[in-house]
Amino acid sequence: MNSISVSVTNGLIFSTLLFVISVAGIIINRRNILILLMSIELMLLAVNTNFLIFANMHHQAMGGVFVFFIMAVAAAETAIGLAIVVAIFRKRKTIDLSKLNTLRG
């Protein structure tokens, strides 16, 4: 085992910690859209880390391929989400979700 390889246990602990932090970010701060988007991206990072760890453990390249496609979808999701946030901010002058609960035009 070389010095840069990560054990499966340490990788899973890291991935679980990332996922728990992102869930806590969603639960604690439900009002700010940007925090919610960042927490969702952190969840996807935790899932990607799991794919890479298990792919490395089983010596398969498919985990890296899955991570590539997940990152592409996450980038598109982030771009669309930020565009929606900018449009909402221009229209309402706030991104606080508690003030955006009405469906006015």
Swiss-Prot record:
It is an enzyme of class 7 (translocase). It catalyses: a quinone + NADH + 5 H(+)(in) = a quinol + NAD(+) + 4 H(+)(out). It comes from the Bacteria. GO terms for molecular function: NADH:ubiquinone reductase (non-electrogenic) activity; quinone binding. Keywords: Cell inner membrane, Cell membrane, Membrane, NAD, Quinone, Translocase, Transmembrane, Transmembrane helix, Transport, Ubiquinone. The keyword Transcription does not apply. It is a multi-pass membrane protein. The chain crosses the membrane at residues 8-28, 33-53, 65-85. One of its GO terms (cellular component) is NADH dehydrogenase complex. The keyword Transmembrane helix applies. GO terms for biological process: ATP synthesis coupled electron transport. It is found in: Cell inner membrane. Its EC number is 7.1.1.-. Its main location: membrane. Belongs to the complex I subunit 4L family. NDH-1 shuttles electrons from NADH, via FMN and iron-sulfur (Fe-S) centers, to quinones in the respiratory chain. The immediate electron acceptor for the enzyme in this species is believed to be ubiquinone. Couples the redox reaction to proton translocation (for every two electrons transferred, four hydrogen ions are translocated across the cytoplasmic membrane), and thus conserves the redox energy in a proton gradient. NCBIfam families: PRK05715.1-2 (NF004320), PRK05715.1-3 (NF004321), PRK05715.1-5 (NF004323). NDH-1 is composed of 14 different subunits. Subunits NuoA, H, J, K, L, M, N constitute the membrane sector of the complex. This is NADH-quinone oxidoreductase subunit K. It comes from Francisella philomiragia subsp. philomiragia (strain ATCC 25017 / CCUG 19701 / FSC 153 / O#319-036). The lineage of its organism: Bacteria, Pseudomonadati, Pseudomonadota, Gammaproteobacteria, Thiotrichales. The gene is nuoK.
